[in-house]
């Protein structure tokens, strides 16, 4: 094979697989930053919707640190934290009445699937998608809350 053809072939392989290689090598997490719930674009079933929620993702030596703060529909505070990796293993959540562990796995550069557990039992699943322009984060969640009430929510967040 001549040198030009080989160079073109290597370039094509890198162009098509480069994203996967960068992702596997620990590319920057596109969720990093502060995200505010857009109530007008979100749907909470059966509801009611929270009054406000802010999610902050930060990179740390231990993985991705997530802090969630807000105000529930009844006026009570929402505040929980977790530090996790996208490796499918369970990581502790502190402060949530609904979950005590979280496991997450990347589907692709913009999508993550997560499972939430309480006392070792799966109580929720979430798909997190970040828009192509990186300014909208959507969480599609199904599961049961601490009272056993089923929910099917789509929460849309705007990057700040």
Predicted feature residues:
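C-terminal segment of classical bacterial N-terminal signal peptides
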Residues: 15-23
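Generic secretory/membrane-interface signal
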Residues: 9-11, 20, 134
